[in-house]
């Protein structure tokens, strides 16, 4: 069974995740993949590497999933994030949302991505073609 929430080193599988999103009540399915690209702010990127505090990341992702379902009236929601080295063109994160109508699924997927960047303890390091590395700005809001 494919989990609703995952933080893993293995490559992410969008088609497997899509299979758990099948729902006869949903008229819309949005499957967003955030992928490693070859540039950032004009610098050529070789690869990305993600680190996480996995137990808290999984907890925060589960809370985001619950809030997205409630806030947008989703029928289903899944969030998978990769950690470790992510080569160019491979998915670093997948957010899948389904709802009766498309607007809710699109809005929910965008909201989840924004919240991941703000709340979830997952950090991205970029390795550049010149051999240098840089942590990408990460600011998190933790709610107690």
Where are these regions (language model features)?
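Short hydrophobic/aromatic beta-strand micro-patches
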Residues: 96-98
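N-terminal, polar/charged subdomain of small-to-medium soluble alpha/beta proteins
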Residues: 1-92, 102-110, 114-144
